[in-house]
Regions:
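Intrinsic low-complexity, intrinsically disordered or marginally ordered coil/linker segments
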Residues: 1-180
Length: 180
């Protein structure tokens, strides 16, 4: 808000006394400068809640709001200690945040598990097999086999955490990386 608009909020007696080089004018100038940062933040508020345009620190905060912090690595070794980092990069985390609501809607399904792995790592070719045959050929009930592309090997810890969090709670799983 500029000085003139602030002055219009004052009683008429004070409005008449406003001049550029008197104490009241100086107070209005200070008030104007104090409001500038808040007004700039409000003017770009929409960018802060858009995962694709949010500043990096705010993108991490959005991820935490969307319960995606379980996929962050912390430099201190434990959640909340040190600086958060996402193994597949901030760009991937932004895309995951963008799709978080839709993914949460279908959480616990094969389709969603494949989709979240694809979005989270930026790699395609994930396959989830439900009740796959065991070592003796009989199907294994309540078990998932996640087949990940070979290129996901450097992100194996992230893939494991995602499968562990997003699979149905009553299932067991194993992860295989396809041959290169």
């Amino acid at each position: 808000m500029d000085r003139a608009r602030i002055a219009r909020l004052l009683p008429e007696t004070y409005q008449a006394a406003v001049a550029p080089h008197n104490p009241l004018g100086a107070v209005l100038a200070v008030m104007e400068s104090l409001q500038a940062p808040a007004e700039a933040a409000l003017a770009s508020l929409d960018a802060h809640v858009d995962p694709l345009r949010a500043p990096p620190d705010f993108a991490l905060m959005l991820a935490r709001w969307l319960d995606l912090d379980r996929y962050l690595d912390w430099t201190g070794g434990r959640p909340g200690e040190g600086t958060p980092r996402y193994a597949a990069g901030l760009g991937r985390l932004r895309l995951l945040s963008l799709e978080a609501a839709e993914l949460a809607r279908w959480r616990g399904t094969r389709r969603t598990l494949e989709r979240i792995l694809t979005v989270a790592t930026g790699l395609s070719g994930y396959a989830v097999q439900e009740n796959p045959p065991g070592p003796k050929g009989a199907s294994t009930s309540f078990h998932l086999r996640v087949v990940a592309p070979a290129a996901a090997q450097p992100l194996a810890d992230l893939v494991r955490r995602i499968v562990d969090e997003e699979r149905p709670a009553y299932t067991t799983y194993d992860i295989e990386f396809s041959a290169a």
